[in-house]
Amino acid sequence: MLDIKKIRADFDGVAAKLATRGVEKEKLEKLHDLDIKRRELIVKSEALKAERNSVSDEISQVKRAKGDASTQIAAMQKVSAEIKAIDAELAEIEENLNEIIIMLPNLPHESTPIGADEDDNVEVRRVGQTPTFNFEPKAHWDLGEDLGILDWERGGKVTGSRFLFYKGAGARLERALYNFMLDEHGKEGYTEMITPYMVNQESMFGTGQYPKFKEDTFELKDDRGFVLIPTAEVPLTNYYRGEILDGSELPIKFTAMSPSFRSEAGSAGRDTRGLIRLHQFHKVEMVKFAKPDQSYDELEKMTANAENILQKLGLAYRVVALSTGDMGFSAAKTYDLEVWIPAQNTYREISSCSNCEDFQARRAQIRYRDEDGKVQLLHTLNGSGLAVGRTVAAILENYQNEDGSITVPEILRPYMGGLEVIK
């Protein structure tokens, strides 16, 4: 959530930055007008409350003197009625103001490329050689079905579209990958967590999924309204919701593997086959809590942690800085890692690493006490390390052989009982 004080102090600057994220200036002007009216009413209310206190003192003095306080009582009743009316108007204005501000995205960092959509993203670097084949490479869904390790037909029968069964070596490969990822992040100082797979709506608000992206989630239809997590970012970030941390302990780094549940609203017709876009998938997440002056260094380190996984798996990838028009709601800066998918002859997203600055911390009220004892908002960061199903897809396609078998990357073989080839 944005700081209303920042909007107040630099309205034109904030409006210009939000315009690059598709926010119309009229919306911000309405917010600005409501804020002015709100502050005027607060001043008026406080003045009337001071007047009411003064009249109350007069009434006490008159009564002590055995006098007639009816005039003062009438005056106080009039003032009290005015205060009640102002406070009611103030509550309505604050509700309207809040409805606007919670729907505004984060301000982009100065280094974030300005653009309308993914076409304006900027490639930062490419790492690794894309493989060459002396045969026509198959898509991972065909490879998985032919090997009997991925079963979409029965996944569709049991549940519906965008669901599948991993079977045999396929299930073992998935498990090997997330265990490998967690081990690697543990070496980098991340504390491994197992989180709840359902969260309350306050948690979804804290990280910015609610209310704007409610349609993208699966929510339980009961009086509790729990939500199946779209990413472990939600429970990990909200772990410290409403708390004040010791600044000397920052940065704090968490990692977790969890299922992620997404309705994929608006994705009809996109990636209808394969592991790229599912309603349920495993993902290893990284989350950091950092001091504001250290958060961008921590973003680079987090991105390097995600890259480390791809490098050790021997997968070619590129790093892309997302434009203001393509970046997620809560992010100030985001790097996407895109892995090479041979059958599609292109790079596809496998990780997003973002610095949300104090945007989520303000919504979730996560603060720290600095060395001077001052309490202030910290910065939150999150990143995929990695999306496991998409990593399976990348391995199947990049490590496929002409006979349809899959060579298991060397780094994973100890996690798969020494298995060298899936056939």
From Swiss-Prot:
Q: Which reaction is catalysed here? A: tRNA(Ser) + L-serine + ATP = L-seryl-tRNA(Ser) + AMP + diphosphate + H(+); tRNA(Sec) + L-serine + ATP = L-seryl-tRNA(Sec) + AMP + diphosphate + H(+)
Q: Which InterPro entries match?
A: aa-tRNA-synt_IIb, aa-tRNA-synth_II, aa-tRNA-synth_II/BPL/LPL, Ser-tRNA-ligase_type_1, Ser-tRNA-synth_1_N, SerRS_1_N_sf, SerRS_core, tRNA-bd_arm
Family annotation (Gene3D superfamilies): Bira Bifunctional Protein, Domain 2 (3.30.930.10), Serine-tRNA synthetase, tRNA binding domain (1.10.287.40)
Q: Does the record bear Nucleotidyltransferase in its keywords?
A: no
Q: What is its EC number?
A: 6.1.1.11
Q: Where in the cell is it found?
A: Cytoplasm
Q: What is known of its domains?
A: Consists of two distinct domains, a catalytic core and a N-terminal extension that is involved in tRNA binding.
Question: Subunit notes for this chain?
Answer: Homodimer. The tRNA molecule binds across the dimer.
Q: Which family does it belong to?
A: Belongs to the class-II aminoacyl-tRNA synthetase family. Type-1 seryl-tRNA synthetase subfamily.
Q: Write down what this protein is called.
A: Serine--tRNA ligase
Q: Which organism is it from?
A: Lactococcus lactis subsp. cremoris (strain MG1363)
